[in-house]
């Protein structure tokens, strides 16, 4: 009985939006925590590398987080794809064109920015976690690996581009999450949009500051 109710809920549009919002919230918390950890690069190699050693000293927790993130990512992508297909099937072409002109740029780019961000995440893991695309990769020396990678202009450019897309994705995603989880009232619409915009800008700017600092010689 409970399984049937859960199945009906998930197959509904409201259910898919809820799953997308909850999984997006978990991924957002990771992005925020990841940024806070990465900003330790400004405190020097010892601080950042010590932080990395601390994380590796907790393998059970680390792998639990990785598994949870992978599950959340799959749910987020699967729900978004299903919602996109459902929207295309339910709306006539004329309505779609009209809706596109009225929607924000961030919302119109959600479905193509997502795959680019996913491609970036895969490259990011190959670069900083596995070291397969970084010829100067040194196991355990996160600081040097970051400097080596971001000293390569195309790598930094791709990272900055991905972070700009992430910022737009976060802005629309946070705003949609407020709506999907019921935190919505016309009186607070502008305030919630501003909160989403400020958070998205701060996260994107914080991430972008790292390759910029490396290329400018501030971090070396």
Predicted stretch roles:
Residues 1-220:
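Membrane-embedded alpha-helical bundles that constitute the cytochrome b-like, heme-associated redox core
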């Amino acid at each position: 009985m409970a399984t049937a109710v859960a199945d009906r809920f998930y197959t509904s549009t409201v259910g898919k939006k809820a799953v997308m919002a909850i999984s997006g919230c978990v991924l957002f918390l990771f992005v925020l925590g990841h940024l806070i950890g990465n900003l330790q690069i400004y405190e020097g190699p010892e601080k950042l590398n010590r932080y990395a050693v601390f994380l590796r000293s907790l393998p059970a927790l680390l792998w639990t987080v990785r598994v949870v993130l992978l599950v959340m990512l799959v749910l987020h992508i699967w729900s978004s794809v299903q919602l996109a297909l459902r929207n295309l099937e339910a709306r006539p072409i004329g309505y779609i064109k009209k809706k596109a002109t009225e929607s924000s740029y961030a919302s119109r780019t959600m479905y193509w920015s997502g795959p680019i961000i996913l491609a970036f995440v895969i490259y990011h893991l190959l670069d900083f976690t596995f070291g397969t695309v970084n010829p100067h990769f040194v196991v355990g020396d996160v600081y040097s690996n970051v400097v080596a990678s971001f000293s390569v202009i195309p790598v930094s450019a791709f990272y900055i581009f991905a972070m700009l897309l992430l910022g737009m994705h976060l802005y629309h995603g946070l705003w949609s999450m407020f709506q999907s989880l019921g935190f919505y009232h016309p009186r607070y619409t502008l305030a919630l949009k501003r909160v989403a915009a400020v958070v998205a800008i701060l996260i994107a700017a914080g991430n972008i500051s790292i390759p910029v600092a490396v290329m400018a010689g501030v971090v070396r």
